[in-house]
């Protein structure tokens, strides 16, 4: 059935009109908890029968995308969550007294479950897309419609017209994304994506420098005497006990290393790590590295023989014959390269805002350190020139020899070591075509422009068709988290482009408002699964069995069951389920793990434990490039040369093959490439003089928890502005202001603080967009202001690169 005809059919079963809850509806109560660990040694801390008060203990975990994975001990009475408490079972033999305690967001989980924003029933759209008007329908009708749409779109346009959007709202193993991908692969495949909104630039650029993406765990800082962090803010982005911040602090307690944090904001990490703050202009990190390199070279502070042993392209002696004679990084820094500009500390100071004397001093400090741990967060790479920032920071430890030795890193952000919990098998996607995840709106609006050499399409020379059937599950990137939301609204509102949008969600998010079919899935406190520690658990890794702490309310369902029903309408239920329920898949995964780790308890015991097992990475696993440093020939990197490639011939070739927009470059060296929207663009800054960068607030994880008002009371969303800039605009803290540029206007309070560099403003990302009658985003979403124009190499999101003006509302 065509989508328009289906939307206009009369429903005979429960055909009440369901008005959407207003975005950001109030939740008025709060409940604080603290959370630790459970292990196999503490199996006695399993849920027990009801106590004298009729309360039962159940176990779950916070599954959002903060990088941690914190266990939640949920107290239930009469099938209702009454509070969340610390999980007090632990084994000091593994991590000492360390307990994985959730942050204030995880502690507010029950308010998400009982939020007035919850989607209760399957619904179809009535009225225009984005109006938020829906009609309740049955599950049978909803799943039958999806099955019919999969068939219709496949027959009319081909499977490339079916797209499953990037999402990170819930990291399940046997439902959520794996369940949907299993269904789509089973039914013929779908248009895939590559990269993520978090790491597009660093994930794309790193292979050209290092090959594989690896980094030393923060435990290595126990052996360091100096720590230099570019835009890394663990105290806010990884603030729970399940994250890396605990590891960092313990390592610093051991080493007493000096910490330098380079960031436009004086972050909480500067405070908690007792660090020196070097405020820097956004987008200019590569210029800082070049200025440091100039001092290293001219003051003979580096060992050139060592650099040439492990690197390609530092000087002319290691350049390939295909490169120009003066194409080395040393030529670039000293001004004997093509641009003829010496990258002196004075040159770098004019760009970065860091005084030349401090740049020289920093170079000397890094060069003289016994073991310097150099690391970058993901914020610096989320810029229009992010790939160059990534490669420049990776070059710094290569130049100074601070890699592959205890207490060092290679410049990368270190992923955690996973425990190894399997995912639901998804099968193989017959469709090999993949697009950069940030360019799905282009694949809807202008598919004819989506080619391998213009838009980074992989697996094919170009797209054959636009996206016609769109799945958006547990994610808000359909609107809220995507750049330039006003542009996105216009594309989604045009029903002649993407014909059907299916949203699977817990809450009526801004993205959910644009659904044609809206399906309610279980929250993680209503779900069951076996899950892994997440990507930012550091050297800690563990496994958690999560239970249905309460019965799924209303008509919400597991995505595994939803997909099984869709498969059933297509005659594929048995192939989809293989005769197993979701719980049986989790049990099977556990048995697979237990075969390798026979000390684990029986599943009947383990599934009641919460945290079942916990492990810690070895010293060898925690140190990046150790084998390479010991013997580069015997243990080469996975780059073409087997070495650290400061000059990348692969990038030089790509720059020749690709067609780039005017003014954009893909250099073979980690050069500083000015961003269009930076303080260096005098034409734009005459109109919009402030650089605006986003940051991860403690009040919500991306857009998850953004509708829990008690968190806003604890951590309000405010735009940070320096007193100098505030005084020029006659602003004081608490004033409601308009932050604006050509892409839109956002209204929110301002915070006047010396913790932000003059000329720079900062706004937390993740607030739910909500336009008033004048088109002003009174929800406070930074993406009303951010650009959709992608970065040159990764075609990634440049959402921290913006120019704006601020005035009183």
Predicted feature residues:
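Long, well-ordered, tryptophan-enriched scaffold segments
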Residues: 265-369
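Glycine-rich phosphate/diphosphate-binding loops that line cofactor/substrate pockets in enzymes
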Residues: 143-162, 217-227, 339-340, 360-373, ...
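Glycine/threonine-rich phosphate-binding loop and adjacent beta-strand/alpha-helix elements that clamp
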Residues: 525-552, 562, 567-569
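Long, contiguous, secondary-structure-rich segments that constitute the structural scaffold
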Residues: 549, 555-609, 701-705, 709-720, ...
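A glycine-rich phosphate-binding loop feature that marks nucleotide/adenosyl-phosphate handling sites
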Residues: 309-312, 366, 410-420, 579-592
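Conserved short loop/turn motifs at secondary-structure junctions
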Residues: 165-172, 347-351, 377-384, 415-417, ...
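N-terminal export/assembly segments and adjacent metallocofactor-ligating motifs
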Residues: 2-301, 473, 727, 771-809
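Extended redox/cofactor-interaction regions of prokaryotic respiratory oxidoreductases
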Residues: 2-5, 177-262, 287, 395-514, ...
